[in-house]
């Protein structure tokens, strides 16, 4: 990803650094409107996901995570910005006339050809079952359930590694550091997701953050006692308790949120690294 640095003409552009991406020109048959409401609230209006709200209107781009066009070659026509994810997307024109969006693989350029199916070349952007891949292959957009489409390693710069194959299962090392088993018949895409330098962007001003639908983050220690357990006191007072707490009084650090009995516990060989 190419980083574009602004000249220092105004305070808001003094430290701005954004990616010089191809402008978005979505196809009408691949987009539809979505009703965004709630602003991080649940059905009762209580905040369940903080610091969300506002933002520019978005059109959802329908992404092909299944890669159902088997053994039909396609050509990358455009590389576009997608407001619904931090990874870029690219438009594919297939030989049978179909046009679909997929996640942009790192290093892919306009004019490259891709294909999905069994016994296809181990090439960046191609999708094939794990059983046909050699060990050590870097992959993304990995299926968990056969035929459901890719669900793992879809964020910008995400990449997993195929480290073993035994019996009916394949062992993968995920971007989080977790090592788990997945059926060898599940499909994945070769390569790494593009837009690797997304974390190097500097928006330069608060207004650009608001356009993304992200609201300001306020520390609890500067609030009033009625708003947060850390609030109150004279001047710069400490939080007044042994351990940090959430706005609702629960422990803020180290609380486990995963269910104790889950079907995938037997498939996880090593937990993710924190």
Swiss-Prot record:
Coiled coil regions, renumbered to chain: none
Subcellular location: Plastid, Chloroplast
Gene Ontology terms for molecular function: rRNA binding; structural constituent of ribosome; transferase activity
Location, primary (coarse class): plastid
Region (Disordered): 1-22, 223-274
HAMAP family: Ribosomal_uL2_B
Record family assignment: Belongs to the universal ribosomal protein uL2 family.
Record note on quaternary structure: Part of the 50S ribosomal subunit.
Name assigned to this protein: Large ribosomal subunit protein uL2cz/uL2cy
Naturally occurring in which organism (per UniProt): Phaseolus vulgaris
């Amino acid at each position: 990803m190419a980083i574009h640095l602004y000249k220092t003409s105004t305070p808001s552009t003094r430290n701005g650094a954004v990616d010089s991406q191809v402008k978005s020109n979505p196809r009408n048959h691949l987009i539809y409107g979505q009703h965004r409401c709630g602003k991080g609230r649940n059905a009762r209006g209580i905040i369940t996901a903080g610091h969300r709200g506002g933002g520019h209107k978005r059109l959802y781009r329908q992404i092909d995570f299944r890669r159902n066009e088997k053994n039909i070659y396609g050509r990358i026509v455009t590389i576009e910005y997608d407001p619904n994810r931090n990874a870029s997307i690219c438009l594919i024109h297939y030989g049978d006339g179909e046009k679909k969006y997929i996640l942009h693989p790192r290093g892919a350029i306009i004019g490259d050809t891709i294909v999905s199916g069994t016994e296809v070349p181990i090439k960046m952007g191609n999708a094939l079952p794990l059983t046909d891949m050699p060990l050590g292959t870097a992959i993304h957009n990995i299926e968990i359930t056969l035929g459901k489409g890719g669900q793992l390693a879809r964020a910008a710069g995400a990449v997993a590694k195929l480290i073993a194959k035994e019996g009916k299962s394949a062992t993968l090392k995920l971007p989080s550091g977790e090592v788990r088993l997945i059926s060898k018949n599940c499909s994945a895409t070769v390569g790494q997701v593009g837009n690797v330098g997304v974390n190097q962007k500097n928006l330069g001003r608060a207004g650009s953050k608001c356009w993304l639908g992200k609201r300001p983050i306020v520390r609890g220690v500067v609030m009033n006692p009625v708003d947060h357990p850390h609030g109150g006191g004279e001047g710069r007072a400490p939080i007044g308790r042994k351990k940090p707490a959430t706005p609702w009084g629960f422990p803020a650090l180290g609380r486990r949120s995963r269910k104790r009995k889950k079907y995938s516990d037997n498939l996880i060989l090593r937990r993710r690294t924190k």
